[in-house]
Amino acid sequence: MSATIHNVRPVTDNLGRAGSGELVPSRYAVRVGDVDVVLISDGVLPLPTSTMSTNVSEADRNAWFDGRFLQRDMFDWALNIALVRSGECLILIDSGVGDGFEYFTRAGQSMMRLESAGIDLAAITDIVITHMHMDHVGGLNVDGVKARLRPDVRIHVSAKEVAFWKDPDFSKTVMPETVPPALRKAAAKFVERYRENIVPFDQRVEIAAGVSARVTGGHTPGHCVVDVASKGEKLTFVGDAIFEVNFDHPDWQNGFEHDPEASVDVRIALLREAAETGAMLAAAHVAFPSIGHIAKNGDRFRFVPVTWDY
């Protein structure tokens, strides 16, 4: 695939000044029992719509985008990270895309937005990386970020994920041709820079009271989700297991999935789990703030966003 990446025009070019004066909301907080969760927008990633549905016809894809008054050729992928406070632990989930990617000029805002929220990077005790794609590790690769983190920060990544990126397989992906080299470079830089901080885990790890990560595979072999559970309430941050189109079409495959068929199975299992338990769900690439519940709608699912809490 050789599609050229270009920016879709944003709703507004005037975002206001950086930091707390931004006109566009960039963070949203919820409480899960005794645990605080903040979703933070890193920005958006303009990508070809074909990457959202590699196994369906152009007509079916166009119908979905037309029904949402969206462009047929390019789609702005939301990019969200999360910050979780449990007791004395402050946990960052993913880090955004960072800088250095000229075709993603409307993302890479996470570190600035953490700072504008009053978060000192040195206060972060743990980081969970759902997977090692550049839009999840890139924020940590920005020059100067490591020096602002505490020297003993624990970075939790599944052992399968670390092993995969030693020799990644892109044979089942359908990406713009510029992306695989950038993914390899970002993953290698992340491992080299944070080798002493990475704490690999097998299938599941408890990070703090009520906060755990579990491997799902699919999107990448070591992809994980993060569960926040406290006092009978639950929220699952699903990383890249679920995309915007997948509530209506969980079987639509994504061009960034290294195992598309396994990804469909993972996606359906997570959607069923949320629908049956009533747990909240949040995702890296669902429109900000991405928090909602899942309702069953025949053979499909329906995303029910939380009502914005003013």
Predicted regions and their residues:
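Active-site environment of divalent metal-dependent phosphoester hydrolases
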Residues: 25-26, 46-48, 132-139, 164, ...
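Active-site metal-binding loops of divalent metal-dependent hydrolases
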Residues: 42-43, 95-98, 132, 160-161, ...
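Basic/polar N-terminal segments that are highly enriched at the extreme N-terminus
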Residues: 1-26, 307-310
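Cap/insert and terminal regions of metallo-dependent hydrolase folds
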Residues: 104, 231-310
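Metallo-beta-lactamase
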Residues: 108, 113-119, 123, 152-215, ...
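Active-site metal-binding motif and surrounding structural segment of the metallo-beta-lactamase
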Residues: 73, 105-156
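Conserved beta-strand hairpin/beta-sheet module of binuclear metal-dependent hydrolase folds
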Residues: 23-116, 225-240
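Divalent metal-coordination and catalytic microenvironments
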Residues: 34, 84, 94, 124, ...
